[in-house]
Amino acid sequence: MSQAVSSPLYAAIDLGSNSFHMLVVRHIDGSVQTMAKIKRKVRLAAGLDEHNALSLDAMQRGWDCLSLFAERLQDIPAENIRIVGTATLRTATNAGEFIAKANQILGHPIDVISGEEEAATIYKGVAHTSGGLGRRLVVDIGGASTELIIGEGFEAKALTSLKMGCVTWLERHFKDRQLTATNFNNAILAAKQMLDPILTQYTELGWNVCVGASGTVQALQEIMLAQGMDEVITLTKLKRLQKQAMLADHLEELDIEGLTLERALVFPSGLSILIAIFESLNIEAMTLAGGALREGLVYEMVQDLRQEDIRARTIRCVQTRYQIDSAYGDQVATLASKLLAQCGGEAWINEPQAEMLLRTAAKLHEIGLTIDFKKGGEHSAYLLQHLDLPGYTRAQKHYLGEIVRRYREQLTSLPEQYALSGTSGKRVLRLLRLAVLLSHRRSPALEPMVELSAQEDKLTLTLDGEWLAKNPLTRTELELEANRQTDIGWPLSIECH
């Protein structure tokens, strides 16, 4: 009997200035699936002296960490492994000593990449894992360097690596561990001076969306969610968190809801750099990217991943993995878009992400049926909220889960969500339910001709009376749906012509 060939494993290791990271994935069905993530706080940059020589203690911390990584690498083909060093290993005068022993421990070569190459790889990781239309600004605050990239699609248009990071700024501007206004102001001002040479180029290029791809940004998002805020980072929120940090006199006393002990040490320095970036570049809002350097390394190795719309690739891979009827998903999505257009399109739901989320839900709403029909909506919600979905933010995944939970039968009001406004979120759900109901025979040729009109939240669905008379099940389901929506304050009437 033939034995199935397992999917190939790939490993990417990033010897960062603050942490060493290892990512192990497998390539399956045109996408990558994360198999392991290992992270150790090495704080290599903190071991640099005034002559940029690494201390023996810092090097030993790094070697000890790599001994752990080496065990996992034994099972992965050499050609599927990429190991890179970044800012601290670019700077250290005795980097050769560290790398020679590290190579022996790992059994694989370490490539110390330039700042520009690091920025390009970060952008590749973001482009393959984060959605969003138009030009994007990517910010990655590392331990000893900060990368800023402007790009569109898979092409980077501006690449910059600046010699400032959360570890080096900690040692330079918070050396006394005091969280004073003076220390914060000095750290922010110094970061702005580093940014000055690139401001003209970056503001002239411009961008449509801004994403952050670092531990600093991830920590900020975790804090904001823990404190009941949405996931979008703004300057106002950063300033609020700075005030919270300054309530502690000393760094070791820092206690902010949602901030883990592991991230606390470099939080004020990373926050200072991010405030400077927001103020210098007049950034309105930032969200967390789906990937960065390690993901970029993986996507460089996996050659046959198509450079296509990230969300389209995600949907296709999920449909394949969970055996979802993609033709029916396309039918529901097409009908949902048609109903939206009949209601006035963007004039009725004036949010650019709304139709994308509507179509995604339409294509994936049956994912839970692979587990069980009876609680299909519940299973669909759980899967969409917990799967890795490149191209979708955490808030969008949460919202998708809540609307597919309610795609049929019983209807309840949506809980608080941050992907869309309350009004838009509700309207998208109403369209999804109608599209699923009207396409229940699973063939576009058998769909009724309908006209949906909207006066604010009052919907009127008009169908051919003769068709309804011949299709009593659909008629009954539409009457029930009208009652369900109307009962929770969403008026829906069914009319015949």
From Swiss-Prot:
Family annotation (SUPFAM superfamilies): Actin-like ATPase domain, HD-domain/PDEase-like
Statement: the UniProt record of this protein carries the keyword Hydrolase: yes
Superkingdom of origin: Bacteria
Biochemical pathway: Purine metabolism; ppGpp biosynthesis; ppGpp from GTP: step 2/2
Keyword DNA repair: no
Top EC class, one word: hydrolase
HAMAP family: GppA
Membership in a protein family: Belongs to the GppA/Ppx family. GppA subfamily.
UniProt name for this protein: Guanosine-5'-triphosphate,3'-diphosphate pyrophosphatase
